[in-house]
């Protein structure tokens, strides 16, 4: 039987912890990982987080750039030979307007539905998202709405060791990103998204966008 343990932290807080399989992840943690990726990837305001400086983005080479937050979020995606992190960054660069980097375009993702995780097998889950990306052209430009309906497949990975006190801000951010012990291993179109948002698009001129192409999903 799994044990329940009482733990008191050095700051005096008390927690009750339950013993779980090392591949177990709480459903809300899984959902929050997907939500975090989407918010960091698609919420652009042209400013480096925590500063008032313009976000010049991260250079991917060949004149391609992504926002700083999108670059950080990409570390939630599986990399290496079996991963598709670089491919996602390339696609994101293709749809990121250059005017984002001088503060003339802003973007916001509005998530209207995020499913409870469905376990595919031990340590792997799928989550469906129905969302709308809103591009705001400044000053006084026409706003554009773009449907973003996706199925995310995630798997449990090793939880990283805490960072030392002298670690850089980027190292600390990456640790926080990976501290849930999850990574995204597949992103595909959620075909059920239209049923979820039925009636939502009438008269809005919302268009579909497929940034995650079939050659690497």
Q: What is the predicted role of each segment?
A:
Residues 39-47:
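Sec-exported extracytoplasmic/periplasmic mature domains
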Residues 3-4, 10-17, 21, 48-217:
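Structured, amphipathic secondary-structure segments that form assembly/contact surfaces
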Residues 9-40:
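Short extracytoplasmic
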